[in-house]
């Protein structure tokens, strides 16, 4: 079985307008992520095309060049910025200093990942049965978890497990924080104003049918439940909301590490 990975990177001046992370940092992490030995579809501005070709040399790769203005959710940029500038929103949202509460472009990019994955599934360039999103900067977690980029990823054993669960969406959840959220039977829309993210959005996947459905559900929550109600938050919040209200469509890797946001699932996929 082939697993197709999907990733993307765009310069949105995050260091100046967001949280201080520089694009050079992301390029160094991106270079590591691009070394993963799996078929990969990569969305970038044409200015990064040669960078991608250099770091994917000899690996099965499809590069799709889109300008920032062409990404799937750029058309929502002004609408999202109007929400972020709204005083009522600022007074209600938890931790308004977060990058997703200041930069509309950040939101346009992070939510576009779901449209990108859906497109990759539809085109299925590498005839895959399973698809995974991997954040461009995820390689910064490789070394701490012992991931060897010289070995197949996911491993043969991991691919067999993924294939067996291809009718569900694979996510990682951090279980030892926010007990009121983790242990709740359902999640209501008040969570859209929360700042506590416990479902990781940097690595997730599934088979074509369930993942397409999931991406459509994210779109519905974003546009119908958040934006129409003058609210915006990050994609991790939306993923947790969908999981809690549709738990039968998910396979959850439960992470009990003492450090928040450690992607233990990265190592498991090479075991």
Which residues does each PLM region occupy?
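Short catalytic/ligand-binding loop motif for oxyanion handling, primarily in non-cytosolic enzymes
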Residues: 13-15, 49-52, 71-74, 139-144, ...
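Extended hydrophobic/aromatic segments used for targeting, binding, or gating
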Residues: 150-195, 213
């Amino acid at each position: 079985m082939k697993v197709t990975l999907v990733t993307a990177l765009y310069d949105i001046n995050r260091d100046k307008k967001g949280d201080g992370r520089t694009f050079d940092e992301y390029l160094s992490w991106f270079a590591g992520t691009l070394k993963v030995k799996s078929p990969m579809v990569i969305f970038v501005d044409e200015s990064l095309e040669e960078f991608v070709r250099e770091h994917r040399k000899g690996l099965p790769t499809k590069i799709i060049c889109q300008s920032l203005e062409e990404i799937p959710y750029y058309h929502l940029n002004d609408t999202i910025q109007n929400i972020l500038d709204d005083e009522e929103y600022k007074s209600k949202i938890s931790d308004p200093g977060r990058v997703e509460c200041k930069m509309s472009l950040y939101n346009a990019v992070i939510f576009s990942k779901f449209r990108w994955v859906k497109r990759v599934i539809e085109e299925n360039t590498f005839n895959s049965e399973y698809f995974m999103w991997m954040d461009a900067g995820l390689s910064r977690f490789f070394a701490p978890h012992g991931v060897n980029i010289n070995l197949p990823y996911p491993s043969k054993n991991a691919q067999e497990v993924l294939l067996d669960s291809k009718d569900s969406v694979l996510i990682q959840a951090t279980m030892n924080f926010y007990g009121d959220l983790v242990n709740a039977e359902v999640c209501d829309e008040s969570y859209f104003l929360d700042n506590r993210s416990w479902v990781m959005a940097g690595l997730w996947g599934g088979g074509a049918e369930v993942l397409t459905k999931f991406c459509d559900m994210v779109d519905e929550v974003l546009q119908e439940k958040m934006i129409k109600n003058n609210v915006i938050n990050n994609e991790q919040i939306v993923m947790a909301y969908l999981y809690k209200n549709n738990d039968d469509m998910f396979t959850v890797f439960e992470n009990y590490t003492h450090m928040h946001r450690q992607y233990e699932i990265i190592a498991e996929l090479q075991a």
